[in-house]
Amino acid sequence: MPQLTPMTDQDAYILRDATGTTGVVDAARLAAGRLADHLIPHLIVGGLAVQEYGYPRVTIDVEIVVPDVLDALEILTADVIGPIFRVRGLEDRVRDVRTQTMIDILPAGKVLKRGCRVPFPLPTVVSEFLQIVPLEKLISLKLDSWAGSPVRRHKDKTDVIELIQRRKLPRDLVVHAAVRQSYLETWDAIQAET
């Protein structure tokens, strides 16, 4: 059985350096540290989590799941001299002005948008270190997001395909029931082409 824990691979470091996106990790670490200072647990989802699981693809923002979005926003933007500020017109997004990285704050227990069926998991660990969402939950969130907007969110499906291949994920990976069939179809299609 493959290891299902994050494994930042050398390719992710090289990619971040070559594309000038190391600031994404810096912004995520700053946010995690501020949240930890106020005993708020977090989980990293999205492209940064995908990188941490071994698929080095470009991402320019950070997605953080927290138990209470309003509390997290207040903590992250409490320092009036920054470097994290709210983004006008986007209630759940902040920007680290040092790196120009956008940080989306996502609600645990809720879904991404209407039509989605997989809720964001509840973070339980308070830490200044990045807490990466478990792989099977990341796969579930990615497939759910893709199913709701298959054209606009096509990268989510690609992330799943790449993670299945790179991590040699099993067909019986325990994903959310709402996306189980989609996972099986994707896994089977990959096997049919190899």
Annotate each language-model stretch with its function.
Residues 1-194:
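Compositionally biased terminal segments of proteins
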